[in-house]
Design a protein with these regions (language model features):
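Short aromatic-glycine-enriched beta-strand elements
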Residues: 42-55
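A short macromolecule-binding patch
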Residues: 58-70
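OB-fold/S1-family single-stranded nucleic acid-binding modules
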Residues: 111-150
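Sec-dependent bacterial lipoprotein signal peptides
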Residues: 1-22
Length: 150
C-alpha cells in the first residue's frame, strides 16, 4: 500500500513539474507590452526607437535594418514596433533610451493629427540628406507610460 501511494505521489509531482516548466506568455492588459530596445535611429533615418516586443505577439513587423555603410552590423527582428524619441512623447529623462533596455509599457495608436505632424519622427529643425534613407519597417505607436524598465 505504501509503494502504491509513493508511486502515485511521484507521478503527480512529476506531472506538476512538467506543467510548470512550459513557457507561457502571461496575459497582459490591453495596450500593454513588454520588449527590448534593439535600435535607436536618427538623422536621415528618422528619430525612431525600435523595440522588439516579446509580449503580446504579432503587434509588430519582422525585418532587417542596417545603417548605410555598416551592413555587417544589421539588426534582425521578428515583432518590432517603432516609437518616437521618448522626449517627444513625454516620457521622463530617467528612462534610458539605449539599446538593450528592457521595457514594460502602455502604448496607443498614432492619431491622424500626429501622422500629419512632421516632427514626430523627424529631426527638428529638418536636415538635408544627400540620398533617400528610410526608417526601419515596423508598426508605429506612441508610448503613453513606462511602467517599468531595466
Amino acid at each position: 500500500m505504501k509503494h502504491i501511494f509513493l508511486r502515485i505521489s511521484v507521478i503527480i509531482l512529476f506531472c506538476s513539474y512538467l506543467s510548470t516548466g512550459c513557457k507561457k506568455h502571461e496575459e497582459l492588459p490591453p495596450y500593454h507590452a513588454k520588449g527590448t530596445i534593439i535600435s535607436v535611429t536618427g538623422g536621415c533615418y528618422g528619430e525612431v526607437v525600435l523595440i522588439e516586443v516579446e509580449n503580446p505577439p504579432r503587434i509588430g513587423l519582422s525585418g532587417t535594418f542596417s545603417f548605410i555603410g555598416n551592413t555587417d552590423k544589421g539588426v534582425t527582428y521578428h515583432n518590432a514596433i517603432g516609437v518616437p524619441y521618448f522626449s517627444k512623447s513625454g516620457i521622463p529623462d530617467a528612462v534610458p533610451q539605449k539599446v538593450g533596455t528592457r521595457l514594460y509599457f502602455e502604448y496607443r495608436n498614432i492619431t491622424e493629427e500626429e501622422r500629419g505632424q512632421s516632427t514626430l519622427f523627424s529631426p527638428d529643425p529638418p536636415i538635408v540628406c544627400l540620398a533617400i534613407y528610410g526608417p526601419p519597417s515596423a508598426n508605429y505607436y506612441i508610448i503613453k507610460n513606462i511602467i517599468s524598465f531595466k
